[in-house]
UniProtKB/Swiss-Prot annotation:
Keyword ATP-binding appears in the UniProt entry: yes
Listed GO MF terms: ATP binding
Coiled coil: none
PANTHER family: DEPHOSPHO-COA KINASE, UPF0200 PROTEIN MJ1399
HAMAP family: UPF0200
SS bond list: none
UniProt entry keywords in alphabetical sequence: ATP-binding, Nucleotide-binding
Protein name per its UniProtKB record: UPF0200 protein Mbar_A0975
InterPro entries recorded: NTP_hydrolase-rel, P-loop_NTPase
Amino acid sequence: MKIIAFVGMPASGKSEAARIAAEMGIPVINMGDVIRKEVSRRGLEPNDSNTGMVATQLRKCEGMDAVAVRCISQIRDAGSDLIVVDGVRGVAEVECFRRELGEGFILISIYAPIEIRFSRVQKRGRSDDMNSIEGLRNRDERELSWGMGEAIEASNIEIENNSTLEIFKKDVVEVLSNYLRQTPSE
C-alpha cells in the first residue's frame, strides 16, 4: 500500500491536488474533515477561529499527531493500494504516518507564495477561511507552531503551485501517475 500525503501552507493547493487525485480514481482522506467533524460535534460555528481552536485543543489533549491517529483506521479500511491524504499539518503527523504505514508513506509538499494563496482564499469562500492577508499570516503562524515547517522540510517531493491551474494539474497528474504505475492493479 502507498499513501501519498499533501502538506503545505493554507490555500497552497492541497485540496485541489486531492481533487485531482479523486478524479484519477484514487481514494482521498481529508484530515481537515476530522477537525470540521469535531467542530460540528461540539455544536460550534465552522469558522477559522473555531476550527483553529478545536485543532489546537485536539493536539494539546491528544498529542500533536491526534488528527493523523484519527485517520489511520480510515486509511486501513479504504481497501486500496494507493490512497491520498489531504492536509498534513505537522511533523508529528508525518512521524505517525511513517511509523504506522511504513515505507509506503510518501509526503508531497505544495508551495505557493502568500499573495497567491490569499487571492485563492478570497475566491474559494469556505466558512473557515480568513478575510484578510493578516488573518492568513496569523493562520500560517498557528500552523507553523504545529510543526508545519518541519513537515514541509520532511517531504519527498515538492510541487510548485504559483502559475495556472492547468500547469498545476499537469504537475500533480504527472507525480501521481508515477505512483499509480508502481502500484499493483486490483
